[in-house]
A protein has these predicted regions:
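The DNA-recognition helices of helix-turn-helix-type DNA-binding domains
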Residues: 66-67, 82, 93
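N-terminal flexible/basic segments that precede or flank functional cores
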Residues: 1-33, 95-100
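DNA major-groove recognition helix of helix-turn-helix/homeodomain DNA-binding modules
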Residues: 73-89
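Positions that flank functional sites
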Residues: 54, 93-94
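Recognition helix of helix-turn-helix/homeodomain-like DNA-binding domains
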Residues: 53-69
């Protein structure tokens, strides 16, 4: 884990309220951005993820691009490759969690 990531994790571990705020902000990011962040947290390059997915590296770059609207199946497949899940959460559940 790099210096900033380590420092952020230590802060989030020490301050649960900050961890919740961080999670809420992360959830508001576009899915391609979340995917790119998680790929980097898993220490995978786009090339390494492409190899896992058996696609060319530019396909991963397009999936992660803010200017591209990837298919949900591509997002789900890439998310599983970085050990993540894509969830649909009802607004009322999100509101309940926000007040926790």
């Amino acid at each position: 884990m790099r210096g900033f990531d380590r420092h952020l994790q230590e802060l989030l571990d020490a301050h649960p309220e900050a961890a919740m705020a961080h999670a809420k902000l992360f959830a508001e990011l576009p899915l391609p951005t979340q995917l790119a962040i998680m790929r980097r947290r898993r220490k995978l390059s786009q090339r390494a993820l492409a190899k896992k997915l058996r696609v060319p590296q530019p396909a991963v770059a397009r999936t992660e691009s803010a200017s591209h609207d990837p298919r949900i199946s591509s997002i789900i497949r890439a998310a599983h490759a970085v050990r993540c899940h894509v969830l649909v959460v009802p607004d009322e559940e999100l509101a309940r969690l926000a007040h926790t």
